[in-house]
């Protein structure tokens, strides 16, 4: 991952990975790659962004995390994403093993025994691709997760997606058009944490008063 390879009960806040290329080459079913973290269990992600990244793996690939594994035996609780987004990311998985796994998603490639909660977040313009495996059910793409394993569920609260090439595993998120992402509609729905910036919403930072200060100085 761009921030960490492995997270266990960790909290990651105010982090962005932009214009990066990440690749995981180990060819087995534990191969994970994501813009922020490769493998996470019980992680808390807040105000994190992944933009214009290229993720390549040989099993699990995600815009944020390659695999989210919240097995109750670990005792660290379920993962959450709040005020997060992925935009313009290309995520691909290509296994050399015909019995292998090839799963990619806008937030996570694989969810294992997870009740993932995603709040006030979105996925936009995700290019998702899988190759190589001949096993039905383990070659898949999805908006927020490529594949849900075991008792995994996605709980969305005020979430959106668009231009992902799929509607699978979107939970209860609402699909929006490219125009709605570009014209400020989605930014308004996401509230004060976001502001329109170019073609899609980005985090709303401190106000810039430099022009006001300059005028007062005159």
Which residues fall in each region the model found?
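Predominantly extracellular beta-rich ligand-binding scaffolds that present long acidic/polar faces
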Residues: 1-218
